[in-house]
Amino acid sequence: MNKKLIISLSILCVVIAVYLLNSHFQKTYNSSSKNLMNITEEGLKKIIIQSGQEAIELIKEDSVWNIAGNDTLKIKEQVINRFFDIASKIEIQNTMTSNKEKWSKYNVDDSSGVHLALIDMDDKTINYYVFGRSKTDFTRCYARINQENEVYLLSENIIYNLQSNPTFAAFS
């Protein structure tokens, strides 16, 4: 009886020690996710979106965003607000590749990607992104940042908010 009690207490001590070690190591684990875009609408003058041969240039005049070269179509304020809201929440989840040869697999090469340039008040490009569609998960997408080779998996799919056709219904 005494031997069974000692064995039981020993097992209990081992389980408690494993639990405490696990808790300690879990506290030291840090997530590596970070925000993709740290932008505000106030610092931007232009947004250029290009997909294939189509491109659209959005220009901020005073506090209103307009489509360059188009007097009849107006951008709804809610479309711009939704873009900045989604853009501020997107996180980089994983690095998928650093190999330029694999860009086409993630649809972030120059011909198949959706390009986004953010230009400040001094006409300098502050950020340049190439987004690619995921073939398996339509709620997320891939991105290259500022002409770097790394391709990242993002937490959300922003491509649906990047329409390069000015007659797209959200802009009319």
Question: Residue ranges of each PLM-predicted region?
Answer:
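Secondary-structure "cap/kink" motif recognition
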Residues: 1-172
